[in-house]
Amino acid sequence: MMKIIQTQLKDMPSSLLAELGSYRYSVFARGEGWSIPSRLSTPGQEYDRFDRSDVSWLIAWHARKGICGCARLMQWQEPGNIEGISVPFDRKEAVWEMSRFSARLDVDAELPLNILWHAVQMAELAGIDYLVSAATPMLEQMFEQHKVGFEPLTPGLIQSEDNLFAVKIPVKQPELAEKYRGARRFSPEEVLPSLGVSMNWQSNGR
């Protein structure tokens, strides 16, 4: 069973933090070819300067397959005076950035929607109006297929992923609510027993 863990970096057990770093490395550094600053380099793991202690994470966890997806949520920082980039928000609107958003479609073809639902739920509870997220054409196609409200934005609005196209996602998502209403999030402590079993199973199976 897939469980969505909600935690902050400061509260994340070291075993889960290491597993997350390895997952991020496999997706973003090895898979997407992103470079890792040398001062943040840990062999086989991916971190960046935005991994602050108060940053929130959603982690999709499967008892046998380990981490299958994630999303990082933090306050969106308006970019500096960059030519060609206009800020698409009213000054009164509260915005979070959702970065490092990924999911293993081979495990669950709709996992991005599940993670996104929990992200907009967290944001709405915190009084946030919109999420800004990096997006791929495939992800935008999935959003359109499942009637997820979003608006394409220009690249450069997400400082932690400034080479990617971005989308503006309102926290009010009726179609996702219909699909996932009642789904809960878990603390790391609730999942840790299965974390230990999974890691032992993985090491024995290699």
Can you name each region flagged by the protein language model?
Residues N163-R206:
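Charge-rich, low-complexity intrinsically disordered segments
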